[in-house]
Amino acid sequence: MIAPFAFAAERSLGRRYPEPPHPYRNDFQRDRDRIIHCRAFRRLEDKTQVFTTRYSDHFRNRLTHTIEVAQIARTAGGALGLNTDLCEALALAHDIGHPPFGHSGEKCLDELMRGFGDGFDHNLHALHIVENFEQRYAGFPGLNLTFEVREGIIKHSRDYAAGEAPELSEYLLEKKPPLEAQLIDFVDEIAYNTADLDDGYEAGLLEVAEIRRHVPLFDRMYATAESAWPAALPKLKFNEALKRVLDSLATDLVGHSARTLEQDKIESVEDVRNHPRRLVSFSPPMAEDCATLKRFLYAHLYEHPVLVADREQGSRMLTGLFAIYMSRPECLPPSYRTRAEHEPLHWVVCDYIAGMTDGFLQRQFQELAGLNHKDPKNTKFTKQ
C-alpha cells in the first residue's frame, strides 16, 4: 500500500501516444524498463562522474551512480510510503541527458551554445532523448514515457518562474512535482556526495584526517566506527564511517520529510502539487552538514590539480570537435546531416556531441582533428 499523497500509477495522465495496458506491469514499471533498455542509458557506462575511467575500473561512472541513486530512492521512497516504481523510473532517468566529461562537459556545451544565443541544459536534453532521439518503437518516436516521468525529468533539481519556458508549459510548471520527483533531488545528492568521498579516498586524493578536520558529520561517524572496530584496518574504518554517513543522510531525509508532510497536513497529490514549496528535504542541521560536505569536496577534491587537468583536456576536445562539425557538417553522420537541412546546425551538433560517451568523443576528435587530408565520405561513423 502506498500513502494517499503518493502518485499511484492508475492516476497517471498517460502517454503522448496511447497504448493498451500491460497484463502485469503498471505504467511506471514499463517506463522503468524502457529507460533501462534504451541506448542512452547504456552510454552512461562511459560518461564521467568525477574520475575518468582511465584511473580505475572501480571508480563511479554515470551508470553506477544512477544505479546507486535508484537503490537509495526505492528504499527511502518505500519508507515514506511513496510509489517506489515511479521513484525508480525517475532515478534511472535523472542523468540520462548528461554530456561526456561530467559537469565540465555540460558547462562547456552551455558556453558554446550561448555563443549562438542559446544554452544547454541536461534536463532538457534528457527530455529530447526520451521524446524524440531514442528510436526503438515502430508506433511512435522516443520512449513514449508517462507524463509524470517526463515531468520529473524536466523538473529535476529546479523550479520554474511564472512565464518561464513557455515551450514546456504542458508540464505544469506552476505546480510542484510529485513527492517521488522531489525525493530524487536529495537522493542524488546523498549518492554523489558519499560516492565522491569514497572515490577521492580510494584515489589517494583525500586523507581521513583531512576529511575529519573539515566535515563534522564524517568526523562523528568515524569516531563511532573507530569505537566499534578499534582493531580494524584504516580502509575498513573509513568504509564503516562512510556507510554511517550515508545512512544518517537517508534517515534524516525520510524522518524530516515525514514530519513535514504530517505538520503541513498533506493528504493528497493535489496538496503536494499546490503547496508553495517542496516538501521533501533534510532537517536544517543535516542540511548544514551536507552543505559543509559539499564545500569540502569542491575545495579539496573537485579542484584538485589532477581532476582540473582532466576537465580542461575534456573541454578542449569537446570544443575542438564542436568547431570541426560546425565548419565541416559533412563529417556528421547521415541522420544528423539530414536534420541540419531544416534545423540550426549548432543545435544538431550540440545534440550529437551531448549524446557521446567520453571515449567516443575522444576517438572522434583524434580522427577528425587530422582530417585535412581525408575524404569525409570515407570516414567510418559509429552510431551514438
Where in the sequence are the language-model features?
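Histidine-centered, transition-metal-coordinating active-site segments
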Residues: 1-63, 70-76, 84, 105, ...
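Conserved short loop/turn motifs at secondary-structure junctions
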Residues: 92-93, 110, 338-339
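Short alpha-helical catalytic segment bearing the HExxH-like zincin motif
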Residues: 87-92, 185
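A glycine- and small-aliphatic-rich helix-loop capping segment at beta-alpha/alpha-beta transitions
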Residues: 102-113
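Basic, low-complexity intrinsically disordered segments
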Residues: 80, 91-92, 162
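Short active-site segment of divalent metal-dependent hydrolases/proteases
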Residues: 93, 97-98, 191
